[in-house]
Structures are given as C-alpha cells and as structure tokens.
Amino acid sequence: MPLALLARAGLTLDGAVTLQPILDALDSRSVPRALINSLDSAFFSGLIALVLGTMIALVIGLTDVRAKGIFTFLLLIPMMVPPHVTAIAWIQAMGPSSPLLQMLGIAPEPGSTHPLYSRGGVIALLSIQHMPLVFLVVLAALRALPREMIEAARIAGARPLAVLRRIVVPLLAPILISAFALAFVSALGNFGIPALLGIPARYTTLPVLLWQRLASFGPDVLTSVAAIAALLAAIAIAIIAVQMTLLARTRSPLIGPPQPPLAIRLGARRPLVETLLALLVAATLVLPVVALTTTALIPTYGVPFNLTTITFANFAEVLFRQQVTLRAFANSTLVAGLAGLMLAVIAMAVGHFLNARQKGYRRAGTALATLAETTYAIPGLVISIAFILAFIRPIPVIDVSIYNTLIIIGLAYVCAFLSIALKPVTAACAQLDPALDEAARISGARFFMRMRRIFAPLIAPAAASGAILVFLTAYNEITVSALLWSTGNETIGTTIYNYEDGGYTTLAAAMSAVTVVATIALMVALDRFGKRLPPGVVPWRI
C-alpha cells in the first residue's frame, strides 16, 4: 500500500496517470544533475565491484588457496557494515587529521582537501561496499558449475586461462549480468556514502537530494519529492526487469546443485596469491577498522595517537552517559529484533506456499517472493517516503497515528528486508520433499497443524538464520530510517550520522566501532550456527 500511494503521488496529476510530475521535477537544475551523478556512480562502482568481486571469487572458488572459509568470512564483513560507518572509517583513515596517518608520519598537509571528498571517493567506497555482494553471487554460481567439464578440460591439457575463457566465463555470463545489476541497484540507492563524501564535494545523488529536501522543508514538499522518489524507484525496477529478461533469454542448463569448491593447483604462485588476498583484506577491512578505533581512542579529533593520548572516555560516553546513544541502541535492538522475528514467520509461510504441490499456493508464493525481490531493489529512502505518505495522517477508523514512532520504522523494515529473510528459507525449502505436506493434508491435517508439526520444525533453523541476517542489516542501517526517525525514536544509524555531521567525530567513531564489533560477533555466531544448516542458508559458508 505505501508504495502504491507513492506511485499515485508521483505519477498522477488531477486524478490522471501522467509523467508530468517527473518531467516537472526534471525541469530544475538539481534533479538532472543528481540523476546523472547517481547513474554515474552506480555504473562505475558496479563495474569495479564486478571486476574485483569476480576475480576474488574465481581465485577462492577454483584454486587451491588455503583458508578459503576465513577469507570468505573476512571479505564479506564490509558488506555487513553499514555504508555510513564505512564512509566514516575511510574519512578518518585518509584525512589530514587521521590519527593513524599522523602516527605513521604520512598524513596529508593540514588544511588540504580530503582526498575522498570527490566523485572518485564516492565511486571507490561504493565499489568496496558492493564488491562482496558480487563476490558472493559469483562464488555461489561457481559452486554450481559442473566440475566434470572443468576437470575434463584440465586432463586434456587445457591451461587455466583457457578453461576460464572457454568454459567458466560463458557459463557464468548470466550470473555476471545479475551480479552487476545487483551492485548497480545497491549503489543507486546508497545514502550513507554519497551523503558523507559527496555533499562536501557538491556531488549530490538522488537519495541525498531527497533527504536534503525533506530535511529542509518537511512534509510541505512531499508531492514534488514523491515524483523524484518514483523516478528513482522506476530506474531500479527497470534495471532488475532488464536483468531478469536477460537471464531468462540466456540459458545455462549445465548449472547444477552446489558442490565443494574446486582446487586447481597454483603451484609456486600460491603464496603470492594468498598474500594478495591478505593485502586486500587488510586494505578493505583492517585499515578502516584500525583508523576508526584509533580515532575513538583519542580525546579530540586531530590529537596525535600515542600512549599518552589514549583514552576510553568516548566509549564510556556513548555506552553509559549519552542518553541519545543509549536510546538509539535500545530502539535499534528492539525494532530490528521484532522485524527479524516477524519476517521469519512471514518467510516460513511464503516458503510453505512455494513448496506446496497445489498450483494456487505455489503461484501465491511466487508472487510474494517476486514482490519481496522487487521491494528489496527499491532504495530505502524511497520506501521511507512511501511510508511517510501512507502514515503521515492518523490511520482511518481507529484514528491512531504511527508517524514519528518506532512502529513506522519497524513496518518499513518489514517491507524493505523481506527478501533477506526469504533467501535462507527458500534455500532450505528446496531440499524438502513436498510429499510430507501432501501426506499430512490427505490425512486430514489442517494448514496450521501442518505448519506447526511438519514444516516449521524442518525450516525453523533456516528461518532463524534469516532473522539474524535481517537483524544484522536493520540494526545499523540508515537508508530507511533517515527520514522516519524523530526525537526519542533515534536509531543507531541516524545517531552515528548526526554525530559525524555535527562534528562530534570521536563519538561517531566510538559508536561506529561498537557497531562493527557487534556485527562481527553476530556474524561469528551465525557462522557457528550455520554448521547445522543446509548449504546456501548462511551466505558466507562454502
């Protein structure tokens, strides 16, 4: 309903469906410029993420490098860390006042322009943020490649590059298209990185422009903002539609069930390849995390980091003294937790429909799964604007307002993150025999009894995994809640952003460091839990 109201507000005029609101929005100078910047940053960051993510996936998926599981886990952490925290970490890692660079004696000159406050900085960090997404998609596809073809080519004397060019790449072509589309759409809707790096460089993207207009003028500009939001949503949906069309036309019938990773011998080059992987992990994960931590451990930003300046006062401030941060931690834990639980239940119901033998149930499940994928492709700020349009007035009949409450944030999370909860459940459902449900139905068991006695016990671990993934995503996010939070209803993401935007850099760093530790801890817990789950449920387990 909220998205339908957004379409109505952005695509109608005097009761008639028309593109005039979008054309009127494009008449201003700021909207076309922001549109070009959005497409520019999404395209080039998606391209870089595709190249890097595919190369890493090929190395881990096809060669005999050691510690594949550890490398996979570490490479996926940047994807789970929210974009605004990534931006803050890199700002503090590369700037003239960076405690880390000052300690190493290689900091830029004081007063010089930050190197990341530029178009290149936005594209670079978007690439780092979405490279793990491409890596994950391509690695999963590599596990489904028929090993017999690759091994036969190797036995016949084909060199690794020939195998890659003649067998692997042609089979992966549709997957590479899909991976690029996912990276493109993710970058298109990204708010945290373009806001923190693009605003100082006057490189404004559409999500940032939407936020600026609503933050400056409030609900009075909802109609014009709805047109821009509808344009952004239309672009995202069009990209996904093109992706699905290309995938449907490009058939790869040799793709099969998941198999253990291949191990083409690298010989004497293996230590070099492993060193390059370790350097990549150090550059994309260790460097920004160390920079974030050193900033959090100094009393004031700009003070050199050494044994005499180290202090834990910033951590004490955000964890024990600041009411706004305590409230934000509590709010995010509550809302993300409830959203995860609700989506686990919904995902189990959708999974049951997808696994049913009756065509009606399967069609309903397919429709809901498609809707979930489409909603996930829509930028979070667009979803938040849709919920503002839907709930800015009290709900009819009951006359209760949820605007400016945690409820509206929670409902937006349910809408935005259903696809995340659904993926582990559908992976587990693919391994169930529909005959179990059919036998219970023939025996007279009703729907809820079949769910409770048969389906739920088998799928519950995968649903729990999906709930944890939703919690990980929603706990730190800012894209959805940036326009929905209010005083007393702050989230972790909005509080960190407000600290950084207000100049409280050390507090922002301390709070960001806490969220990074919490994210990694939850990922480790899910990894341990994933040992008892079917393959494909926990994304990074290979």
Where do the language-model regions lie?
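The alpha-helix within a helix-turn-helix
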Residues: 153-154, 440
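Short glycine/proline-centered loop/turn elements that form peptide/ligand docking sites
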Residues: 145-149, 432-436
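Alpha-helical transmembrane segments of integral membrane proteins
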Residues: 241-276, 362, 537-541
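Polytopic alpha-helical membrane proteins, predominantly small-molecule transporters/carriers
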Residues: 35, 157-158
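Glycine-rich helix-loop "coupling/hinge" segments at transmembrane-helix boundaries
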Residues: 192-219, 304-308, 478-505, 538-542
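Membrane-water interface segments at the C-terminal ends of transmembrane alpha-helices
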Residues: 1-15, 29-143, 171-192, 196-198, ...
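A short amphipathic helical element positioned immediately N-terminal to and/or at the very start
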Residues: 18-27, 310-320
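Juxtamembrane inter-helical linkers in multi-pass membrane proteins
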Residues: 159, 251-265, 301-315
